[in-house]
């Protein structure tokens, strides 16, 4: 399985960055099966199994206990990077973005853009108000696979779904407009699980472009990790490599450290605040507490400091 990034790289849902979307869907499937689930994504498990990555299919279907993928750094309760907390992590993240979209559309926004949509099935599972148009933007192979798989499941969108099959490194605003997007109307944007897979300068360009395409009253939700303190970056890489090694023992060969872009970058919240967005932010620890979940252990990934941000463009 190819992991190392290079300029112009592409992927499907079983390779490189694409397989992280399948991992996320596996976690949503696990969260949906929880005793007191915070989310309900009935499409997550069948989509993961349709992709066909064995380890992720077993996690999604409950045949493999994610605790078997923990390592000695994860602590008794589990740190944010522990596989045993994977379902909890994805439950609070998914609920955060679900509620963001439902609140935005309840406030009258009828135009939604999901960037790097992956195996996101919100266009099929959320109770969208009548007249809502949901644009899904992702690589052509990803869009085509999900559309076909959901059709084979007999699923029907609960909003008007428009697909924009384009790489975010290409002229995606033109493709979005060609699909009917109207930049003069307020939009609800999500950049979920995306920013860390962009080089720092590309992250800024993406946020700038969202701002340029946003009419006043538009809303945006995203999440971002803090910049590592001096000396922490190598520890983080080592931790990610250790996690990848545990996966390899179960037949899943993916180097997570090779997929993300390290280095100093503008943190999303202050950057957006400086470009006309009025923002609110919470940490993932706040979301765990608000949803009655056991607190996360500390570890050297700083995942517990992940910041979830939403705001309105003024």
Swiss-Prot record:
Entry superkingdom: Bacteria
Residues spanning the signal sequence: none
Record family assignment: Belongs to the UPF0677 family.
Record's protein name: Putative S-adenosyl-L-methionine-dependent methyltransferase MAV_4441
Protein keywords: Methyltransferase, S-adenosyl-L-methionine, Transferase
Enzyme Commission number(s) from the entry: 2.1.1.-
Summary of the function given for this chain in its UniProt record: Exhibits S-adenosyl-L-methionine-dependent methyltransferase activity.
Keyword Ribosomal protein included in the entry's annotation: no
Ligand binding (S-adenosyl-L-methionine): 138, 167-168
GO molecular function, one term: methyltransferase activity
GO biological process: methylation
InterPro entries per the UniProt record, alphabetical: Ppm1/Ppm2/Tcmp (IPR007213), SAM-dependent_MTases_sf (IPR029063), SAM_mthyl_Trfase_ML2640-like (IPR011610)
Pfam families in UniProt: LCM (PF04072)
Matches recorded under PANTHER family: S-ADENOSYL-L-METHIONINE-DEPENDENT METHYLTRANSFERASE YKTD-RELATED, S-ADENOSYL-L-METHIONINE-DEPENDENT METHYLTRANSFERASES SUPERFAMILY PROTEIN
């Amino acid at each position: 399985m190819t992991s190392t990034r290079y300029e112009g790289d592409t992927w499907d849902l079983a390779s490189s960055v694409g397989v992280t979307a399948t991992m996320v869907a596996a976690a949503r499937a696990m969260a949906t099966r929880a005793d007191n689930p915070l989310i309900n994504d009935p499409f997550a498990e069948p989509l993961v199994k349709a992709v066909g990555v064995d380890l992720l299919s077993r996690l999604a279907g409950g045949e493999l206990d994610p605790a078997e993928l923990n390592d000695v750094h994860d602590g008794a309760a589990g740190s944010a990077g522990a596989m045993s907390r994977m379902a909890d992590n994805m439950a609070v993240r998914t609920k955060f973005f679900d509620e963001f979209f439902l609140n935005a559309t309840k406030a009258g926004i009828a135009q939604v853009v999901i960037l790097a949509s992956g195996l996101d099935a919100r266009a099929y599972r959320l109770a969208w108000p009548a007249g809502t148009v949901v644009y899904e933007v992702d690589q052509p192979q990803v869009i085509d696979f999900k559309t076909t798989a959901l059709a084979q499941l007999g699923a029907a969108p609960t909003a008007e779904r428009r697909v924009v099959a384009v790489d975010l490194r290409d002229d995606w605003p033109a493709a979005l407009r060609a699909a009917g997007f109207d930049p003069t109307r307020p939009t609800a944007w999500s950049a979920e699980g995306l920013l860390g897979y962009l080089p720092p300068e590309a992250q800024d360009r993406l946020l700038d472009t969202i701002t340029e395409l946003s009419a006043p009253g538009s809303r945006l939700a995203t999440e971002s990790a803090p910049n590592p303190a001096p000396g922490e970056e190598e520890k983080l890489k080592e931790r990610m490599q250790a996690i990848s090694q545990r996966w390899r023992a179960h037949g899943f060969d993916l180097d997570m450290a090779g997929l993300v872009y390290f280095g100093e970058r503008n943190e999303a919240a202050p950057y957006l605040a400086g470009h006309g967005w009025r923002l609110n932010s919470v940490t993932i620890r706040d979301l765990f507490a608000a949803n009655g979940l056991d607190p996360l252990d500390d570890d050297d990934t700083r995942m517990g400091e992940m910041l979830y941000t939403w705001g309105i463009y003024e």
